[in-house]
Amino acid sequence: MSKNFFMRVTLKLFAMLGDHLPAEMVGQRRAGNELTVDVPDGTSVQEVIDRFRLPSRLVHLVLVNGVTIPPHACGGHVLSADDEVAVWPPIGGG
């Protein structure tokens, strides 16, 4: 697929993952953990994760439009315009 056009997707980072947003983007966040970004057509979930330098050890659960994307499938899951990508770190407690 050509990467000559851009589409808008929403990225939601939960818990400490929000700390990985670049300082210049913090002002663009909505509702504290949500950021709308323009990405080239054909962008995969993994490319979005990589763009924000999210450490792989902290990327535990990824959903696109509420559907779980297994970690091994993030590189092959191509996003569409207006998709919502939600990322959670591992949950601890007891």
Specify the residue positions occupied by each region the protein language model found.
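Ubiquitin-like/PB1-type beta-grasp interaction modules and other compact soluble beta-rich domains
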Residues: 1-93
